């Protein structure tokens, strides 16, 4: 029996699936249950929740994983037989091209990304089950590439894989289907199914063909990875018993109203009715990001493309608000840590060699004898008194005077944040991300920027369903207050 579980935002899809897992565990062995999802994050979250709920170990649940990793295991592939970033770079060198590659599981998002349009065309074609030429003719790439260059690239890539006996992620799935390597399960769960590519649907089918019961869970309205090969139409056309989740535990009423307006613009979708929670919630509109008062609470700030986050960073930086950009390492983290360690040292706490060398890096020779780091006992703990007595440390002033070698801009930022009462030893209150980067996330306050880049604007006009789904996902991250920033150009941008 095949059941399609439709899970609108915040309706507890994973919990529902685990309750079904529970029923099967009463009558079957854990290793007869397959639970596959698109991202590693979701597969492991389900596995960990199942382990604690049913008191099982990781070994009891060998089939809670991504489809890629099932294929990898069943085909008995070794890690060094898989095309890695270095292989793509090496191939690029040999061809005189730049071929970069970001791991499928960078961020555990299950997505393949590259800046090389040649490689992207080849990969997306494979995921969609079409030829590279057919993908080329869809004109989704932006770089100037000739068909001849593409054919040459395909030839060289195949030759490279043969020469070095390598396989790539998508080949694994195709091989798995060809070799018919699926175990026999009593029940299979396929989560986040709206993100599967045509090739992965083929693999899913080869698994459920040998299985008594199958649950396919997802939400076509949240299918935001079509550009990366996801095949939402296969999800929409699935037949089986429909199990519709109707109560959202996340979305308040006003956000539900906005979400309904957006979702009704999507042409190709499965109809769903779902209810918000009882809270009314809040909705605000602004002309400019700087008008939003973000001095308190937890925030998710969402833009359509990565580069749009840079201006927002500048605003938060100048206001002295504690934030992180999901796509960058925190520029101040090292300095905060040193500040905390320094303050502890001044209070009489002893600190390690590593902490001292970090502190020393923000001081000039006038304040710290750098040479002594060579002779210092790496395993000992040190106090302010011992460092001062040895004349290694020549100041015990407050950090912003003592750290005379620290970049002044960062010092000012940290001081401003502290004046604002920001808690610098915990995770930042404000997270900046693209909408694609927070799928599955939620926050009390969500700021949604509706500007579109030129490329996106063009895509929106040609294919509005993709952008409608994306802004639906953006709006439905809000647990309480949705803050919408109107587009800078009223003729462009996404209207909410």
What is each PLM-predicted segment?
Residues 66, 168-172, 428-436:
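Conserved two-lobed SF2 helicase motor
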């Amino acid at each position: 029996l095949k059941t399609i579980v439709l899970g609108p935002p915040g309706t507890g899809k994973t919990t529902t699936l685990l309750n079904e897992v529970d029923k099967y565990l009463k009558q079957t062995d854990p290793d007869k249950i397959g639970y596959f999802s698109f991202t590693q994050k979701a597969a492991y979250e389900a596995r960990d929740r199942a382990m604690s709920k049913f008191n099982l170990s990781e070994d009891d649940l060998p089939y809670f994983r991504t489809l890629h990793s099932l294929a990898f295991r069943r085909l008995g592939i070794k890690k060094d037989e898989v095309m890695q970033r270095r292989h793509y770079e090496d191939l690029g060198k040999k061809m005189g091209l730049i071929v970069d590659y970001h791991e499928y599981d960078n961020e555990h998002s299950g997505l393949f990304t590259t800046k090389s349009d040649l490689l992207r065309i080849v990969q997306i074609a494979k995921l969609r089950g079409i030829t590279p030429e057919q993908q080329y003719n869809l004109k989704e790439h932006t770089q100037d590439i000739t068909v001849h260059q593409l054919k040459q690239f395909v030839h060289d890539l195949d030759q490279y894989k043969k020469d070095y006996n390598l396989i790539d992620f998508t080949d694994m799935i195709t091989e798995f289907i060809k070799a018919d390597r699926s175990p026999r399960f009593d029940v299979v769960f396929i989560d986040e199914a709206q993100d599967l590519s045509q090739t992965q649907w083929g693999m899913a089918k080869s698994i459920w063909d040998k299985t008594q019961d199958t649950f396919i869970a997802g939400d076509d309205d949240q299918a935001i990875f079509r550009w990366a090969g996801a095949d939402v139409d296969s999800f929409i056309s699935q037949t089986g018993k429909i199990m519709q989740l109707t109560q959202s535990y996340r979305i308040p009423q006003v956000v539900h109203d906005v979400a309904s307006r957006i979702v009704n613009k999507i042409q190709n979708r499965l109809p769903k009715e779902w209810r918000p929670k009882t809270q009314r919630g809040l909705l605000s509109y602004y002309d400019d990001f700087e008008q939003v008062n973000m001095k308190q609470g937890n925030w998710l700030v969402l833009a359509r493309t990565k580069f749009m986050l840079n201006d927002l960073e500048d605003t938060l930086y100048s206001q002295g608000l504690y934030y992180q950009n999901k796509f960058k390492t925190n520029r101040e983290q090292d300095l905060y840590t040193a500040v905390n360690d320094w303050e502890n040292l001044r209070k009489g706490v002893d600190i390690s060699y590593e902490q001292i060398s970090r502190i020393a890096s923000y001081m000039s020779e006038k304040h710290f004898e750098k040479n002594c780091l060579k002779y210092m006992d790496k395993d000992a703990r040190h106090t302010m008194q011992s460092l001062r007595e040895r004349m290694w440390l020549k100041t015990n002033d407050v950090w912003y005077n003592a750290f005379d070698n620290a970049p002044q801009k960062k010092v000012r930022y940290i001081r401003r944040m502290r004046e604002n009462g920001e808690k610098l030893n915990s995770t930042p209150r404000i997270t900046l991300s693209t909408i694609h980067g927070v799928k599955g996330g939620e926050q009390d306050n969500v700021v949604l920027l509706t500007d579109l880049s030129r490329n996106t604007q063009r895509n929106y006009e040609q294919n509005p369903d993709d952008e409608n789904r994306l802004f639906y996902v953006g709006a439905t991250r809000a647990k309480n207050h949705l803050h919408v920033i109107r587009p800078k150009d009223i003729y462009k941008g996404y209207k909410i």
